[in-house]
Amino acid sequence: MIVPIVLFLTLCPSELSAWGSPGDPIVCGVRTETNKSIQIEWKEGRSEKLCQIDRLGHVTSWLRNHSSFQGLIGQVKGRPSVSYFPEGASYPRWSGLLSPCDAEWLGLIAVSKAGDTDMIVPGPTYKGKIFVERPTYNGYKGWGCADGKSLSHSGTYCETDSSVSSGLIQGDRVLWVGEVVCQRGTPVPEDVFSELVSLSQSEFPDVCKIDGVALNQCEQESIPQPLDVAWIDVGRSHKVLMREHKTKWVQESSAKDFVCFKVGQGPCSKQEEDDCMSKGNCHGDEVFCRMAGCSARMQDNQEGCRCELLQKPGEIIVNYGGVSVRPTCYGFSRMMATLEVHKPDRELTGCTGCHLECIEGGVKIVTLTSELRSATVCASHFCASAKGGSKTTDILFHTGALVGPNSIRITGQLLDGSKFSFDGHCIFPDGCMALDCTFCKEFLRNPQCYPVKKWLFLVVVIMCCYCALMLLTNILRAIGVWGTWVFAPIKLALALGLRLAKLSKKGLVAVVTRGQMIVNDELHQVRVERGEQNEGRQGYGPRGPIRHWLYSPALILILTTSICSGCDELVHAESKSITCKSASGNEKECSVTGRALLPAVNPGQEACLHFSVPGSPDSKCLKIKVKSINLRCKQASSYYVPEAKARCTSVRRCRWAGDCQSGCPTYFSSNSFSDDWANRMDRAGLGMSGCSDGCGGAACGCFNAAPSCIFWRKWVENPSNRVWKVSPCASWVLAATIELTLPSGEVKTLEPVTGQATQMFKGVAITYLGSSIEIVGMTRLCEMKEMGTGIMALAPCNDPGHAIMGNVGEIQCSSIESAKHIRSDGCIWNADLVGIELRVDDAVCFSKLTSVEAVANFSKIPATISGVRFDQGNHGESRIYGSPLDITRVSGEFSVSFRGMRLKLSEISASCTGEITNVSGCYSCMTGASVSIKLHSSKNTTGHLKCDSDETAFSVMEGTHTYRPHMSFDKAVIDEECVLNCGGHSSKLLLKGSLVFMDVPRFVDGSYVQTYHSKVPAGGRVPNPVDWLNALFGDGITRWILGIIGVLLACVMLFVVVVAITRRLIKGLTQRAKVA
């Protein structure tokens, strides 16, 4: 706790011992002795300290107006002995400027005792300091300790310090926090002050309070933390904070720019000073004599008044947001600020008051607590997305895509910002129950689902075809009659031409034949032999044309009959990879080492690796269930991008003032800093400096007509401290999200990326061997992640090391910390991002920066780019995954590496009995068929079902249960004998049922199918003709023939009946007409 004290300043008579010689620095001399009996009024809480007032504007006037003051002017060691924070503050270099202490002596500001709510800023080393002062947002505060004590290192309390003596305080025991210069400012009206405050609020939107005083209204704010900020004091209730501003120094021909004194005596009287200024009745330096005029006779009078220009830049004018003010004080210091805390997106939770309802073709999400913002629902390998806005939202999948029981996974976000994720379960119509239309496209594709309607439909179709054929025949006959009249002349001309051609050909053939006869007479014997050979060849010639039509049905059957891979793949592990030994409890302990390849399956399906060893009735399975197959970004080197803002500042100095002695100094380079900026900006920040000529002369507020110097600097800063991690994508590769189930029952979710093995889990590592895929428009996409909130986006970006304007990555930093502060040693940029325009008094800048936040908001995940929907996952390093909206076929398989995976097999056989109760689903499709098996087992084991079309394995529990393994078939009517092996016990089961044909899924708004493997069937546009005939008439050619004959006979009989009824009706109507 800081102990408040009341001390009295020890003073001595105001005798000025020496003023130095003309041209020397003016330093107020002091007496070495002190007069403790003389006291002045002192403010409560101030410690005993001395302030130097040398070479100050109005110093002579101040002394003259305070002639009754009996005190010590000046500090023994001079101002440089006072400590400053930050070190190396620039204003001590300008001895003509007022420090806060000086300004208080002149009555410009008032330093008050720090209260309990005032906070001392962290950063400086306070140990050994007796008095500390810093500007606060609404004043100037001082902290002090009593005699014999000094502040602790952190400044939070006073501690005993034997090296601190009472009486006069040495300068190195006084600490000024901040860089402050003061002057007599010009008051500003209330409306101007309100405009300045409004500008300040817009530049500091995230700052809630400064030193406990509200700047912006915030819903939630952080704890106080230090903030280094530039400010001006215009004499109002509080200071005005600034970021981007400009300063200029003006010189005015007034008494406050000169000091008049008598060498060795002290200040001139008021009358003497007025005479110097108005009549020139004194001597002085060159500037004073040029401005006021010095009489020649006074130049040699060394005892008269001498006036000299105060060696200071002049009076400071600050331009902030286009408003120019002459402040009372201008500074850069550390204050305590609270920042707005943005409510982060709530963690993924179960949605309270949310539930799922199953509707036709999709689901309905009901959110009771808040409206839905967005949601993604996945079932099997189909997904659908929706943007809500209400508490009840319908989300539809592909038409007819979902059949049977389906697990539903829902992830989304509510309007109140909370995220949720929960699972549901829906049972959709399966098999023929999913078809509820008559004489529609699905009816034509699945006649097996309409045992009565299909025959009626066939009869109607045949009758319609017959009628159409009769109509077509009549039309052709009519056309033939009409054509006889129209084409008769043309036919006559063609006949005459043909006759002439035949006669010409006959004459030509006769001539050729005569020539051949003459030659053959001479070679009669050769001709005879040749004739015999020809007769022999004719005996072996073809007896008639080949009947191609007999072979066509066979070829069609061969081409249209397809055998598809199973939806749930089963692979038997090689026994040589398994090493077993006997263990207690009738078990074998086995270790698996080696490698196996599992064929790829589609999302929602499982691939199994079956383990069995000779002599053991038991077997186990390792299962890989594919949850999704997506595109993932294969990241190149990452970098960090700040949410940067362009800044610039400038200071104009007249010629001869400060650094502008002979124009822009040669040493001022792109990395130089003006003294006016000494601690107002981070010297380690990324920026560029320069110096240019400005206006000069009286019109520009300068004594010298030569061009003044405009020192300018442009830089970038990150006021919000928001940083994005940008990861350019070298390529987009396939990755799978899988659920690995070990034979022991342990389950783990993995995300293998193409060509990269996962970490070893219980002796198992998975490598996904996916094919490459190319999508136009994705080559320059980069993953972007906001490091604070975790928001992710996809957008084009620059390659590492190439800061090209117009893309994300114009500024690239090597670390988060470098990006927060945009350090020059850790960031690169293009200096053209911030343009600079020089004006008469200052320089203004314009920004060409690309807003990273705006780009991220535009392409925020979830998003659809180049026909690919991108979502944000919950696992893995690469958190963005893409799903092509169009049906995408890829190839791939899983490589499973084993390094000592443990496996336990029972040596006791199980007794299994059961039957197949139902088969439903689709054939030659992506989802496959579901086989219902009711089994009773004497123990937990593994069941292996092998049919002619497919085989599968599933876990069997002790007792009676119903299991629904998935299998794949390539025909509509199933009638197969299967073998069930359950824990060493084998039995035969009969599998009968009908499956439906599933079309390639049709899209609805917001719905898409996840990427699937090309080796697994995915449906088609039309059924296989053989499957369709089997579904219509039954399995086998005999049934086809009988069915076709039956349909034709039915059509004939129906035709006869219809004709008979028609004739009878016509005859009846005719007889009635005659009677009438």
From Swiss-Prot:
Cited Pfam families: Phlebo_G2_C, Phlebovirus_G1, Phlebovirus_G2
How the protein is affected by changing N406K?
Answer: In strain: Isolate Human/United States/2/2009
Task: Report the record's disulfide bonds.
Answer: C28-C51, C145-C158, C182-C329, C208-C218, C260-C307, C289-C294, C351-C354, C358-C426, C378-C383, C567-C608, C580-C590, C633-C729, C648-C845, C654-C702, C660-C709, C664-C691, C695-C700, C782-C797, C813-C827, C912-C982, C922-C925
Query: Which portions of the sequence form the region Internal signal sequence for glycoprotein C?
Result: 544-566
Output the GO biological process annotations, alphabetical, semicolon-separated. fusion of virus membrane with host endosome membrane; symbiont entry into host cell; virion attachment to host cell
Q: Which first-to-last residue range defines the signal peptide? A: 1-18
Which residue ranges run through the membrane? 456-476, 1041-1061
Task: Give the record's glycosylation annotations as residue positions.
Answer: N857, N918, N940
Q: Where is this site: Important for glycoprotein C and glycoprotein N subcellular location?
A: K1074
| Annotated site location: Cleavage | A103, E104, G566, C567
Cytoplasmic topological intervals: 477-539, 1062-1076
Q: Where is this region: Golgi retention signal?
A: 477-523
Q: Indicate yes or no for the key word Protein biosynthesis.
A: no
Region annotation (Fusion loop) ranges: 654-660, 695-709
- Keyword Thylakoid among UniProt keywords: no
Q: Which residues lie on this side of the membrane: Lumenal?
A: 19-455, 567-1040
* Outcome after substituting R889K: In strain: Isolate Human/United States/2/2009
The family annotation for this protein states: Belongs to the phlebovirus envelope glycoprotein family.
Query: What is the name of this protein?
Result: Envelopment polyprotein
Task: Provide the organism lineage as a comma list.
Answer: Viruses, Riboviria, Orthornavirae, Negarnaviricota, Polyploviricotina
